[in-house]
């Protein structure tokens, strides 16, 4: 998967299209990411010792990696490729050519 935790990304599809934020969690087994402040859903919680009445909690839900593009340091969004630099495999922005790692 080309997106990692801590990457700055732009959402390119869905209800939060155009939002730029940071990846909180990457879920490579299901090809999804959780992005800060994106795809907020309301989760109904049962009553427990902390919340005797129960609660409705807003939290971030995962979105598919195909709906985000990684931004480089200059804020250019593009596809991610891999190349070898000094014997190390690094990610780079295919549009700007800038190394991401």
Swiss-Prot record:
Pfam families: KOW, ribosomal_L24. Belongs to the universal ribosomal protein uL24 family. GO terms for biological process: translation. It comes from the Bacteria. One of two assembly initiator proteins, it binds directly to the 5'-end of the 23S rRNA, where it nucleates assembly of the 50S subunit. One of the proteins that surrounds the polypeptide exit tunnel on the outside of the subunit. SMART domains: KOW. InterPro entries: KOW (IPR005824), Rib_uL2_dom2 (IPR014722), Ribosomal_uL24 (IPR003256), Ribosomal_uL24_CS (IPR005825), Ribosomal_uL24_KOW (IPR041988), Translation_prot_SH3-like_sf (IPR008991). One of its GO terms (cellular component) is ribonucleoprotein complex. Part of the 50S ribosomal subunit. It comes from Streptococcus suis (strain 05ZYH33). The gene is rplX. Disulfide bonds: none annotated. Keywords: Ribonucleoprotein, Ribosomal protein, RNA-binding, rRNA-binding. This is Large ribosomal subunit protein uL24. GO terms for molecular function: rRNA binding; structural constituent of ribosome.
């Amino acid at each position: 998967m080309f997106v990692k935790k801590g990457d700055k990304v732009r959402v390119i599809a869905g209800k939060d299209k155009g939002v730029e934020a940071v990846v909180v969690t990457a879920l490579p087994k299901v090809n999804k990411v959780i992005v800060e402040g994106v795809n907020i859903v309301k989760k109904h919680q049962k009553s427990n010792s902390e919340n005797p009445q129960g609660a409705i909690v807003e939290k971030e839900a995962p979105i598919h990696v195909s709906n985000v593009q990684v931004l480089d340091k200059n804020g250019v969004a593009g596809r991610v490729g891999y190349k070898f630099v000094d014997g190390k495999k690094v990610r780079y922005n295919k549009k700007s050519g800038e190394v991401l790692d």
